Amino acid sequence: MTQSNLLPKTFRTKSGKEISIALGTGTKWKQAQTINDVSTELVDNILLGLKLGFRHIDTAEAYNTQKEVGEALKRTDVPREDIWVTTKYSPGWGSIKAYSKSPSDSIDKALAQLGVDYVDLFLIHSPFFTTEQTHGYTLEQAWEALVEAKKAGKVREIGISNAAIPHLEKLFAASPSPEYYPVVNQIEFHPFLQNQSKNIVRFCQEHGILVEAFSPLAPLARVETNALAETLKRLAEKYKKTEAQVLLRYTLQRGILPVTTSSKESRLKESLNLFDFELTDEEVNEINKIGDANPYRAFFHEQFKDL
């Protein structure tokens, strides 16, 4: 089902706070940089995004782009209170251990690199880690550290990325009260992967957890043979939009908040210009059906094999 028509430009977390489409600052921005360099290209891109109307910036410890976000926050004319900043604790991956000695250290490092007194949303980047990778922290203990940071005012909201239902249930159990349940689960979502793990979107939406989508444009950017090509072309022509705008609008109408990025000003503008048209229920269902028949997963292949 789609959400109601005339979608607002912002969603709300279950605590009532407004959150809008995110400008991502993922690792592609630092591939040509050494770890201590600051990418002026990324700083300029964030400043451009803010100028065009983005009010949500998504970064992460693992991206190594918090310094760039901090520099942009320092230079922009947009008041800090009008910008939603999301970042993430990296608990380690494969042979790579967590960058910080603890989740609390990760939060303090984020505040310092971002140059802010608080972060609007702090996520655990992945639930797939061992205590050896995290210097001794289980998922529940990492969550307890986020709870304490929220109590201390260092973070306003807390959540997770790439969580399946069993992970979320662990976080519920580790929370002192529903006030400290995760408010966001950021997952890979696009027509070819409508549930990163079994029934995750419905579960989140039934429990007041906002689903954010990374890689919402995967059918255009990552898939070699796009089974949606004809459908997207037809809908783009019908609504006088780009195929990317059709996909982002589809994501919104599924009740999911996209995280997107581009180095091109025209595409950044397009990503914000999604609210003057609406796909019909039949069109959304057509995209759903074709997507389900052509599954594609870009990330976490092994981790979700049994989830």
From Swiss-Prot:
<keyword id="KW-0560">Oxidoreductase</keyword>
<feature type="active site" description="Proton donor">
    <location>
        <position position="125"/>
    </location>
</feature>
<feature type="binding site">
    <location>
        <position position="222"/>
    </location>
    <ligand>
        <name>NADPH</name>
    </ligand>
</feature>
<feature type="binding site">
    <location>
        <position position="161"/>
    </location>
    <ligand>
        <name>NADPH</name>
    </ligand>
</feature>
<dbReference type="GO" id="GO:0016652">
    <property type="term" value="F:oxidoreductase activity, acting on NAD(P)H as acceptor"/>
</dbReference>
<feature type="binding site">
    <location>
        <position position="27"/>
    </location>
    <ligand>
        <name>NADPH</name>
    </ligand>
</feature>
<dbReference type="GO" id="GO:0004033">
    <property type="term" value="F:aldo-keto reductase (NADPH) activity"/>
</dbReference>
<feature type="binding site">
    <location>
        <position position="28"/>
    </location>
    <ligand>
        <name>NADPH</name>
    </ligand>
</feature>
<dbReference type="InterPro" id="IPR020471">
    <property type="entry name" value="AKR"/>
</dbReference>
<dbReference type="Pfam" id="PF00248">
    <property type="entry name" value="Aldo_ket_red"/>
</dbReference>
<feature type="binding site">
    <location>
        <position position="26"/>
    </location>
    <ligand>
        <name>NADPH</name>
    </ligand>
</feature>
<feature type="binding site">
    <location>
        <position position="261"/>
    </location>
    <ligand>
        <name>NADPH</name>
    </ligand>
</feature>
<comment type="subunit">
    <text>Monomer.</text>
</comment>
<feature type="binding site">
    <location>
        <position position="58"/>
    </location>
    <ligand>
        <name>NADPH</name>
    </ligand>
</feature>
<feature type="binding site">
    <location>
        <position position="263"/>
    </location>
    <ligand>
        <name>NADPH</name>
    </ligand>
</feature>
<protein>
    <recommendedName>
        <fullName>NADPH-dependent conjugated polyketone reductase C2</fullName>
        <ecNumber>1.1.1.-</ecNumber>
        <ecNumber>1.1.1.358</ecNumber>
    </recommendedName>
</protein>
<feature type="site" description="Lowers pKa of active site Tyr">
    <location>
        <position position="88"/>
    </location>
</feature>
<feature type="binding site">
    <location>
        <position position="262"/>
    </location>
    <ligand>
        <name>NADPH</name>
    </ligand>
</feature>
<feature type="binding site">
    <location>
        <position position="186"/>
    </location>
    <ligand>
        <name>NADPH</name>
    </ligand>
</feature>
<feature type="binding site">
    <location>
        <position position="264"/>
    </location>
    <ligand>
        <name>NADPH</name>
    </ligand>
</feature>
<keyword id="KW-0521">NADP</keyword>
<feature type="binding site">
    <location>
        <position position="267"/>
    </location>
    <ligand>
        <name>NADPH</name>
    </ligand>
</feature>
<comment type="similarity">
    <text>Belongs to the aldo/keto reductase family.</text>
</comment>
<dbReference type="GO" id="GO:0042180">
    <property type="term" value="P:ketone metabolic process"/>
</dbReference>
<dbReference type="InterPro" id="IPR036812">
    <property type="entry name" value="NADP_OxRdtase_dom_sf"/>
</dbReference>
<dbReference type="InterPro" id="IPR023210">
    <property type="entry name" value="NADP_OxRdtase_dom"/>
</dbReference>
<dbReference type="InterPro" id="IPR018170">
    <property type="entry name" value="Aldo/ket_reductase_CS"/>
</dbReference>
<feature type="binding site">
    <location>
        <position position="217"/>
    </location>
    <ligand>
        <name>NADPH</name>
    </ligand>
</feature>
<feature type="binding site">
    <location>
        <position position="260"/>
    </location>
    <ligand>
        <name>NADPH</name>
    </ligand>
</feature>
<feature type="active site" description="Proton donor">
    <location>
        <position position="63"/>
    </location>
</feature>
<dbReference type="InterPro" id="IPR044494">
    <property type="entry name" value="AKR3C2/3"/>
</dbReference>
<feature type="binding site">
    <location>
        <position position="215"/>
    </location>
    <ligand>
        <name>NADPH</name>
    </ligand>
</feature>
<comment type="function">
    <text>NADPH-dependent conjugated polyketone reductase with broad substrate specificity and strict stereospecificity. Reduces ketopantoyl lactone (2-dehydropantolactone), isatin and camphorquinone. Does not act on menadione, p-nitrobenzaldehyde and pyridine-3-aldehyde.</text>
</comment>
<dbReference type="GO" id="GO:0047011">
    <property type="term" value="F:2-dehydropantolactone reductase (A-specific) activity"/>
</dbReference>
